[in-house]
């Protein structure tokens, strides 16, 4: 069974990232799955890769901190060596540490930018370089946030990193478009993931349903469905976009 292509997904151990891996594999992609290189996350990645292989697709585990350039270079190189190329990069990994502006430390700020903005830049840079070398169309996809549009009280560092990612996405689209490489990002609203539940609690998430036009929160699978389209050939005329997927939250 030939592959539709090869996709790298960062932040893949749980939540939205995991759902994206499952969806892209179901779409026919072979996958390289990434998350932090600690025992707990690697165990989750290994289990996920085994689940994907059981469906007939290829899957490799490429753990590492995507804020480090040498690590991202190795992730791309290992993927090319073991799976044959890179057609889709989903730079999904991100962190969110809540803190008022007046008590946010420089270290908190820098760590957030390193993962959420520099990490996406490095993924786009090295996957984009590989796509150019391959001489065929590719898809760069970033994990944004509604906070990149609206700001986020108690989350200024996070919101700023996601706003920066919007500009990065637009810039990459304009640079790489002539080579058939598109760059887009998805900006979820409230989605029930381990990260959001850990930061806000289930009671808060339940209370937010009424703030959405559809009277519900999103699921990781909702986000994965959008990524599935952005990764497809059918999305070729969409680029430079950060697409809000928020149940109408900003429109009511």
UniProtKB/Swiss-Prot annotation:
Q: Looking at the keywords, is Electron transport present?
A: no
What the record says about family reads: Belongs to the short-chain dehydrogenases/reductases (SDR) family.
Q: Name one Pfam family in it.
A: adh_short_C2
What's its top-level EC category?
oxidoreductase
Give GO terms for biological process: fatty acid elongation
What organism, scientifically named, is this protein from? Hericium erinaceus (Lion's mane mushroom)
**This enzyme's EC code(s):** 1.1.1.-
InterPro entries the record matches: NAD(P)-bd_dom_sf, Sc_DH/Rdtase_CS, SDR_fam
Catalytic residue list: 158, 162
Q: Which residues form a coiled coil?
A: none
Q: What is this protein called?
A: Short-chain dehydrogenase/reductase eriH
Pathway the protein acts in: Secondary metabolite biosynthesis
Q: Gene3D superfamilies per the record?
A: NAD(P)-binding Rossmann-like Domain
Q: What does the protein in this record do?
A: Short-chain dehydrogenase/reductase; part of the gene cluster that mediates the biosynthesis of erinacines, cyathane-xylosides that show unique biological activities, including leishmanicidal activity, stimulating activity for nerve growth-factor synthesis, and agonistic activity toward the kappa opioid receptor. EriH also catalyzes oxidation of 11-O-acetyl-cyathatriol into 1-O-acetylcyathin A3.
Query: PANTHER family in the record, alphabetically?
Result: 3-OXOACYL-[ACYL-CARRIER-PROTEIN] REDUCTASE, CHLOROPLASTIC, SHORT-CHAIN DEHYDROGENASES/REDUCTASES FAMILY MEMBER
| Record-level Gene Ontology MF annotations | oxidoreductase activity, acting on the CH-OH group of donors, NAD or NADP as acceptor
Q: Which UniProt keywords apply?
A: NADP, Oxidoreductase
Q: Where does NADP(+) bind?
A: 16, 65, 92, 125, 158, 162, 191, 193
| Kinase as UniProt keyword | no
Q: Which gene encodes it?
A: eriH
**SUPFAM superfamilies attached to this UniProt entry:** NAD(P)-binding Rossmann-fold domains (SSF51735)
Catalysed reaction, written as an equation: cyathadiol + reduced [NADPH--hemoprotein reductase] + O2 = cyathatriol + oxidized [NADPH--hemoprotein reductase] + H2O + H(+); 11-O-acetylcyathatriol + A = 11-O-acetylcyathin A3 + AH2; cyathatriol + A = cyathin A3 + AH2
């Amino acid at each position: 069974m030939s592959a539709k292509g090869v996709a790298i997904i960062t932040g893949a151990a749980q939540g939205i990232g995991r759902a994206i891996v499952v969806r892209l594999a179901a779409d026919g992609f072979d996958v390289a799955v990434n998350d932090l290189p600690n025992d707990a996350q690697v165990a989750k990645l290994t289990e996920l890769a085994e689940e994907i292989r059981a469906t007939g697709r290829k899957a490799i585990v490429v753990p590492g901190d995507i804020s480090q350039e040498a690590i991202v270079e190795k992730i791309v190189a290992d993927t090319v060596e073991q799976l044959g190329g890179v057609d889709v990069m989903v730079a999904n990994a991100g962190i969110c540490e809540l803190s008022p502006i007046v008590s946010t430390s420089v270290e908190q700020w820098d760590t957030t930018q390193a993962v959420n903005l520099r990490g996406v830049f490095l993924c786009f840079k090295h996957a984009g370089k590989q796509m150019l070398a391959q001489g065929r169309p590719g898809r760069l996809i970033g994990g944004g946030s509604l906070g990149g549009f609206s700001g986020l009280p108690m989350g200024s560092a996070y919101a700023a990193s996601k706003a920066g990612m919007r500009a990065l996405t637009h810039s990459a689209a304009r640079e790489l478009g002539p080579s058939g490489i598109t760059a887009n990002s998805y900006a979820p609203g409230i989605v029930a993931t381990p990260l959001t539940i850990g930061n806000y609690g289930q009671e808060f998430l339940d209370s937010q349903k009424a703030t959405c036009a559809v009277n519900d929160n999103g699921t990781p699978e909702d986000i994965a469905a959008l990524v599935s389209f952005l990764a497809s050939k059918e999305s070729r005329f969409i680029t430079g976009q950060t697409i809000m997927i928020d149940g109408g939250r900003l429109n009511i």
